[in-house]
Structures are given as C-alpha cells and as structure tokens.
Amino acid sequence: MKPMHPGGFLEVITGPMFAGKTTELIKRVERQIFAKRKAALFKPAIDNRYSEREVVAHNGLRYEAFVVPTTEKGVERIKEITLNEGYEVIGIDEVQFFPMSVVEALNELADQGIYVIASGLNLDFKGDPFPVTKELLVRADNIVYLTAVCTVCGKPATRSQRLIDGKPAPRNSPVILVGGRESYEARCREHHLVPDE
C-alpha cells in the first residue's frame, strides 16, 4: 500500500446540468490559490461551448485552463503537467468525458499529495450513471452533490433533460452531446422524460 502524503485529497462535485458544478469548481480552486497553493484547471478539448482555452460556467464565470483531449494521452497529459509543474491543487471540469483511466490517474495524484477536485455530471440525459463519475464517487474523500431548479415546476432538479427542437430527446439519441441551454434543461424526477422513440 502506498503511503498517503499529507494534503492528498480527492473531491468530486456532481449533479445535473445548471446546478453550478463548474462555478463551485472555480471557487474551490480560487480559494486554494488565495491560500498560496499552486493550482491549475483542466478541461476536455471536446467542451468548446463558451471558450477554447478557459473553463466557463453557464453564469459566465471563467478561468484559464489546460485543454486536454479526452483520450488516454489526455489523461497522461494531466498527470505530466501536474507533477512536472509542481501543482498542489488541480481541478478537472466535465470529468465524465474522459476515459475510465482518469479515475486511477486522479486517485494516484491524490495519493501523491495533490488536492484533486473533479467536476462532472453524475447521470446522462436518460438518467443512467456516467461510468467515470460513478467510479470517482466511490473513491472520493468528499462528495459535493448539487441540485438545479426544475424548469417545469421549480422543485430541486436532479436530472438533465436533453431537448431536440424543444421536445425530450428519445432514448436512442447519442449519449454525448456537448451543449447548453439550447439542448438541455434541468428537471426534477417527476418531469424528466425519456421517450422510447
């Protein structure tokens, strides 16, 4: 068993779209920078909704980030940059888009004394768990579960409703579709719909 270095910690921020996950990630990283810890953010290259080079929350909050591909090489790049540049704190946005190897990589970084904060969706638009987030949740030292507000009734929303031409996307739609308010809404369990066709 590897010894746990002081300061190593794996934290996961999760919930549906529009719950404030990216905002919370940026706030936590900024807090560590204020505490004089060397910190960096990473984002998947697939997420270019608002910026090519920044992590950007739906509310407009933004922070410069390393952009890495959602491949095994991208996961290795996260480790290399973190260790070679001496980062004490790293944040990874939209972690659900990375391959499963990111789970072990982030766990190893935490074991080496890095404070790792991963932010990502827990469920896809059908209500099924994202495998990467699911695995990170069982390994996390701390879990921050955020809810949004249902766009139909105003109750706490725990689901991400995918829309196509303003209507719920059918079950056979592709799982990955990077988008914002034009493609998704936050919904409660009662108002989350996934038609078969």
Swiss-Prot record:
Annotated catalytic residues: E94
Pfam families named in the record: TK
Location of the protein in the cell: Cytoplasm
Coiled coil feature spans: none
GO-annotated cellular components: cytoplasm
GO MF annotation terms: ATP binding; thymidine kinase activity; zinc ion binding
Binding-site positions, ATP: G15, P16, M17, F18, A19, G20, K21, T22, D93, E94, V95, Q96
One annotated GO biological process: DNA biosynthetic process
List of residues binding Zn(2+): C150, C153, C188, H191
Catalytic activity: thymidine + ATP = dTMP + ADP + H(+)
Organism domain of life: Archaea
Gene3D superfamilies named among the record's database cross-references: 3.30.60.20, P-loop containing nucleotide triphosphate hydrolases
The entry's keywords: ATP-binding, Cytoplasm, DNA synthesis, Kinase, Metal-binding, Nucleotide-binding, Transferase, Zinc
SUPFAM superfamilies: Glucocorticoid receptor-like (DNA-binding domain), P-loop containing nucleoside triphosphate hydrolases
Enzyme class: transferase
Main localisation: cytoplasm
Description of how the protein assembles with itself and partners: Homotetramer.
Family in the record: Belongs to the thymidine kinase family.
Protein name (database record): Thymidine kinase
Species in which this protein is naturally found: Thermococcus kodakarensis (strain ATCC BAA-918 / JCM 12380 / KOD1) (Pyrococcus kodakaraensis (strain KOD1))
Lineage of source species: Archaea, Methanobacteriati, Methanobacteriota, Thermococci, Thermococcales
